[in-house]
Amino acid sequence: MKVSRRNFLKTTIGSAVFAGSPAAIAKAAEGTKIPKRKFGRHEDMLTVVGIGGHTLYYTGSQKEANEVVHRAYDLGVNFFENAWGYHKGVAEEYMGNALKGKRENVFLMTKFSNFRGDGDPTLEGAMKHLEDSLRRLKTDYLDLWMMHNVVGNDAQDAYKSDGAIAAIELAKKQGKIRYGGFTGHTEPKIHREVIEGGYEWDATLMPVSVVGALKSRAFEEDTMPLCKKHNIAVLGMKGFGGSRRTHLHGQTSVEVVLRYALSYDQVCTHCLIYTSPSPR
């Protein structure tokens, strides 16, 4: 069955309300369009679902991207994520253009990836990624800037004097970001190393999936308690296991995926918005 972007957005937001606590549902009835959760140890409140930049690209045009972003915004979504490396910058450009006039009302996140081979693997390279992202997203600051997809020796490299943490701290000092974090898809062990290195991370993005794909169970069993211990906000992803099959074949639903993710207190939002034939 073909599902339109508009209908999936409506279904997802409805499921987000239904998946929330009774108090959240009561607030929704009073006019809050979608439940929110506290961003880790900080006071920011994020909607429990968000728009992902990677799939926003597959709308195919700026006009279609605008439609998705504006519809989600009107429904109350305030979390928008992206990455410097998504589709050679077009994903960030789509989002930046779509958020014109709305920037101050949203929580905007993007990622840098120069330390894993995309461009210049130095502090200067990371700052160039930041300037690129700010330009494309048409903003002078980010709410959250994250090191993209930690693997291999990334934990050790992040703590070097010219590594990712140095870039995050410099960007904070310059007033270009508010918070710093890191992401990962497949290596819970590396997540642990990054966290236990001692830096006070604000957030991490990792798989939280009811279908148990992409080592999500290992992330949930090993990384989630660490995040709770250090009061690190968890942003969930890959709720459908990174594949449209579980959704299109009726193996699970938006409501089930969200209920599962939100069963963890540390999860404050989940990137679970349909913008292509492949909800993730």
Question: Locations of the language-model features?
Answer:
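Acidic (Asp/Glu)-rich catalytic clusters
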Residues: 40-43, 96-103, 134-138, 195-198, ...
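C-terminal segment of N-terminal export signals and the immediately downstream linker at the start
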Residues: 23-49, 63
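Short, acidic/polar
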Residues: 60-72, 122-135, 187-194, 254-258
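Glycine-enriched alpha-helix->loop->beta-strand junction motifs that scaffold or abut catalytic
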Residues: 196-204, 229-233, 265-267
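Conserved small/polar residues in nucleotide/adenosyl-binding loops
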Residues: 274-279
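N-terminal secretory signal peptides and thylakoid transit peptides that target proteins
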Residues: 1-16
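Distinct, well-ordered alpha-helical segments
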Residues: 91-100, 124-133, 155-164, 186-199, ...
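Conserved, mostly hydrophobic/aromatic
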Residues: 39, 51, 80, 95, ...
